[in-house]
A protein has these predicted regions:
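Short helix-initiation/N-cap motifs at beta->coil->alpha
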Residues: 34-40, 128-143
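Paired acidic/hydrophobic, glycine-rich loop segments that form the ligand-binding mouth/hinge
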Residues: 148-153, 172
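Long, aromatic- and glycine/proline-rich binding clefts that accommodate carbohydrate-like moieties
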Residues: 174-176, 225-277, 281-282, 306
Length: 306
């Protein structure tokens, strides 16, 4: 009928992934961190303890609260920017139908960037963040307990487990707080879908349908989706399968509590990710002021919508 359909692979969510054990050893009750100010105060407290050497005996490599991989275009250009926009637009279709970016919560975006950068080792020279990539943030940061917090999602669980399962099991997820809007939520969405090529041979299409049904609906397939893939199921008939991945459990908790915002970034025009990331990187490098960065973001969005 001219429409494209897909089966969602999983539900994914991202926020401030944190090392629960480090926070506990610092005397910080993470369950109270449900607002911007509370998270900011906790990060300041933890950074002070790191700088004083109080945690050095147990965590000899711990040098900063956070790392932020600004080199990866999808981190600032999609995920960070999505957070304030998800408080402004109901869904990706609404943003996609707009000729203007909007960015009603620009001040909240500034506050979020401050929160995510002022507790990094690059706090005195944010241009250094533009050289930080995913592997530095995860494998060379969170996984070796060099830092305690990163902006990431439950998709990093399997990688962390492969590096150090003990550390992987310490992970939790704090909200990605949009000050003055939604401060206790995480963005949740579907990033990947299974599709069947309509031009394939009929036997291939039928076999593909059987495989997808088996993977997502059989007892064996469900366990693979949850345990091996580390996914949060996108279907409601998984009550008999317990999620084992710590970060996926956290995403499910936010969903169950109704503490989620949408992935409106799926409504960005083609080519916007690279441009928006360059705008963020220009801000970090000092090429733009924050207000100039916002104007660049709006202009890039508008140009691509023409």
């Amino acid at each position: 009928d001219g429409k494209v359909y897909g089966i969602p692979v999983s539900v994914e969510g991202y926020g401030l992934v944190y090392n629960k054990e480090i926070f506990k050893d610092a005397g910080i009750d993470a369950s109270t961190l449900t607002s911007y100010d509370a998270i900011d105060a906790a990060f300041a407290n933890l950074q002070e303890q790191i700088d004083s050497g109080k945690l050095k005996d147990k965590y000899p490599q711990l040098e900063a609260v956070e790392e932020y991989a600004a080199k990866e275009t999808w981190i600032p250009g999609l995920h960070t920017l999505n957070a304030p926009l998800a408080c402004e637009y109901k869904n990706a279709n609404e943003l996609g139908a707009s000729d203007d970016l909007g960015l009603k919560y620009a001040d909240s975006l500034k506050a979020l960037l401050d929160l995510e950068t002022k507790y990094t080792t690059s706090k005195d020279d944010l241009s250094k963040l533009n050289a930080v990539d995913y592997s530095t943030e995860i494998g060379g940061g969170l996984a070796i307990e060099r830092v305690a917090v990163v902006q990431q999602g439950n998709w990093i669980g399997p990688e962390l487990k492969g590096i150090d399962e003990t550390v992987a099991n310490k992970m939790g997820m704090l909200p990605l707080p949009i000050k003055g809007a939604k401060e206790d939520c995480i963005p949740v969405g579907i990033s990947i879908k299974w599709c069947i090529n309509s031009q394939s041979d009929e036997k291939v299409k039928e076999a593909s349908k059987q495989f997808i049904n088996w993977l997502f609906q059989s007892d064996e397939g469900k366990k693979i989706v949850v345990d091996d893939f580390g996914c949060v199921p996108a279907f409601d008939n998984y009550d008999d399968v317990e999620i084992s991945d710590p970060l996926s459990k956290e995403v499910k908790r936010y969903i169950d509590e109704g503490k989620t915002t949408p992935w409106v970034m799926d409504g960005f025009p083609s080519g916007f990710e690279a441009k928006s990331a360059a705008d963020f990187q220009g801000y970090f490098s000092g090429e733009y002021t924050f207000d100039e960065m916002v104007e660049h973001l709006k202009a890039d969005f508008k140009d691509l919508k023409k």
